Amino acid sequence: MEAHVPFDARYLAFLETITQLRPRLHRYCSRMTGSVMDGEDVVQDALFEAYRKLDQYDDSRPLGPWLFRIAHNRCIDFLRRRGVRVEAETTAMGPDSVMPATPPVLGVGRAVEQLVMSLPPKERACILLKDVFDYTLEEIAELVGSTVGGAKAALNRGRSKLAASPEPVKSHREVNAELSRLLHLYVDRFNKRDWDGLRELISADAQLRVVDRFAGPFDESPYFGNYDRQRVPWRLTVAEVDGELAVVVMRQHRDEWRPDSVARLEVIDQHITRIVDYAHCPWVLPSASSMVVADCP
């Protein structure tokens, strides 16, 4: 979605109608892209594309498959733009992947989601759609733009590769020292409510996107004030989410601090140039394949 797209009443009403589908769309896109944040960005683009094409939608057919088709195409576009190849995809769950201290027991579907990252996009899509989302071969063929025979062949190839694949090898991704330094400084000043000090870290032309709420110049937003007014106690921390350094918002539940939401910061020339906050997307952070908290309070 473009940076200055207004969240008008009609678009927000459209989002309201597909509320139940969004977590499933995100789950699919995050496994296709290898990142819960990239996955949500792709979903956002797909939903805005769907909104613009509503006049082309045949309302006699289910809405879900139509949205999945758009989201799938956006995932493929994303992978092509990034030049993602199999070698890179095998590390997409992050270096030294560490699950939270008390990870949930994974069902078959969730386990499959984590394993398919080693597969090429078409095989990955077919396995996710069949084994996780329970689509028929006919539906899968339509979603991925293939024949039933082609979808079945991709599904069988993917399953064979997964059955023969060894345990994934943990790898180490080079840490961006500049990003790490700025994120820790950002978190420290944010937790101290040092708003003036934070503004020193942010470039004059920085962009802010609070998903589903705001998209535009940072200096035109009430971002800091919105956090300052929140009643539920919160703290920020630096964490690796799906292998990417990010800012995680921790919220206090009784005597325990729990991860609640995530924000991605982009840095150029020692200044923060873009912030994407997923605070209003509660399905994003729980979908992460790995999260390593650097300085949990």
Predicted segments — roles?
Residues 3-27, 37:
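A short, charge-rich alpha-helical start-of-domain segment used by transcription regulators
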Residues 25, 29, 67, 71-79:
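Hydrophobic-face residues of short alpha-helical interaction/recognition segments
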Residues 126-127:
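A short pre-motif secondary-structure segment
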Residues 138, 148-237:
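Solvent-exposed, charged amphipathic helical/linker segments at domain boundaries
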Residues 25, 39-50, 70, 140, ...:
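Short, small-hydrophobic-rich alpha-helical interface motif
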Residues 7, 44-63, 81-84, 165-166:
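Sigma70-family region 2
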Residues 78-102:
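Short, basic/polar amphipathic helix motif occurring as a linker/hinge flanking DNA-binding modules
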Residues 121-122, 133-150:
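Helix-turn-helix DNA-binding module
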